[in-house]
Each structure stands twice: as C-alpha cells, then as structure tokens.
C-alpha cells in the first residue's frame, strides 16, 4: 500500500513501555484514530494488515502488541498465551488505554475520540475497553470472547457499538450474541448486532480456513461506515 507509512512504535501503558504497529495515511492530516486489537495468535501479519487497510481508508491505526513480541501459529501455544493474558486482563486493558492515549496525543489524529476494534480474544477486549476505558468514540468487537460482561459493565458503555458474530461460531455462539444484544437494549446503548448466517469463528481472517470473503467484505464496510459516521464527522 504505497499511500500509507508503517512502522513499529513504542508507547507507555500498564506502567511499562509497549510496542505497536502504527499505520498512517500519507498526505495532510489530521485523520481519525483506530486501535486494532489482536487475536490470540499475537501481533502477526493479518492484524498488521488490518491496521494498514485502515490507514489506506484514511485512519491512523495502531495495533498494540499484547504478547511482548510473542507470535505463534500453533493453537495450543496460542491458547497458553491467551490464558496467560486472561489472568492479567486488567493489565491488557491498561496497555490498550496506553495505545488509545498514544493516538489521542498524536499530532495527526483528530478528533480525540478513538475507534476500537478487535477479533476473537481482541473482540472480548474490545467489549471490556468500551465499558471501562476512556476516549473511545466507537467500538466494533468481532466474535469477542473472554471474561463475561455484567449488565453493570454494559451500562457503562458510552460509545456506539457494532457487534459482529457468526451463526456457525461454536465458541462465541449466537446465544452469546443475543445475550449481549439484550443487555445493550436494556442499557439503551446505541448499537447494532449482526449475526452472519454462514460465518464461522474467525471468518474475517483471510489467512484462516474459516475465512468468508463475502461476509468479511460486508463487515469491513459496515465497520468503516460506523467509524466514519462517529469519528470523521465529529471533527
């Protein structure tokens, strides 16, 4: 993508220095900012590519490394890494807050409300970020698992939510999707819940067997539309 620049950056969060993949459009800013939260594999090529796609669409995108450099393609190892992170969920959220703060402070980012999206484990973190972190302008969790959200947590969400699920997902089931939808309805959270009928878990990841190109393309356009409506037009 010749119309963007990318590099690894350092930012402060959770009381330490963290690394992240930053993708920025070329040309004159400012642009809205988006944090992209990894799956359980780590900060690998697919997540970096999602950040790059955001930059090509006119966003400054930062994908924080929640595993401190560890990346795997083996499910057993990914599960171990994810379980370790889950035991330090609040620390991971603090790193994500650091990534949000980095974008808020970035000269080329405006407005100072940041979009957040994540996939699988990152989807779960997106839910919790929307409920617990500051400076979030919109949230798009993809098939987000992780620690359950209570109705009290959901009631703290202040930003619009686009919640994306797959009907064939055996891990984060349609029942979970419907439960989250009911909680957002009760809390009067502006939201849309989409359960794609022919989509499995990880349908957005074009490096995985579950990838569904048509569904992924539709989800991408819906996500861009939300971020443009809530972030770009508020400048």
Residue ranges and their predicted role:
Residues 118-122, 126:
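Gly/Ala-rich beta-loop-alpha elbow adjacent to hydrolase catalytic centers
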Residues 168-172:
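Acidic catalytic loop of the alpha/beta-hydrolase fold
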């Amino acid at each position: 993508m010749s119309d963007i620049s990318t590099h690894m950056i350092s930012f402060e969060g959770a009381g330490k220095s963290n690394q992240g993949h930053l993708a920025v459009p070329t040309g004159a800013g400012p642009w809205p900012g988006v944090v992209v939260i990894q799956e359980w594999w780590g900060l690998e090529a697919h997540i970096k590519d999602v950040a790059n796609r955001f930059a090509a669409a006119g966003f400054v995108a930062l994908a924080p490394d929640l595993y401190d450099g560890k990346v795997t393609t083996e499910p057993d190892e990914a599960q171990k890494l994810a379980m370790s992170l889950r035991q330090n969920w609040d620390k991971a959220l603090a790193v994500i807050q650091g990534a949000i703060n980095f974008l808020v402070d970035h000269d080329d980012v405006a407005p100072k409300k940041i979009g957040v999206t994540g996939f699988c484990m990152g989807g779960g973190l997106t839910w919790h970020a929307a409920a617990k972190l500051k400076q979030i302008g919109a949230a798009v969790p993809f098939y987000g698992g992780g620690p359950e959200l209570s109705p009290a947590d959901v009631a703290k969400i202040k930003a619009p939510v686009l919640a994306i699920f797959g009907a064939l997902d055996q891990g984060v089931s349609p029942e979970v999707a419907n439960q989250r939808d009911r909680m957002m309805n009760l809390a009067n959270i502006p939201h849309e819940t989409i359960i794609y009928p022919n989509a499995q878990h990880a349908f957005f990841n074009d490096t995985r067997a579950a990838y569904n190109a048509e569904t992924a393309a539709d989800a991408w356009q819906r996500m861009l539309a939300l971020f443009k409506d809530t972030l770009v037009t508020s400048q």
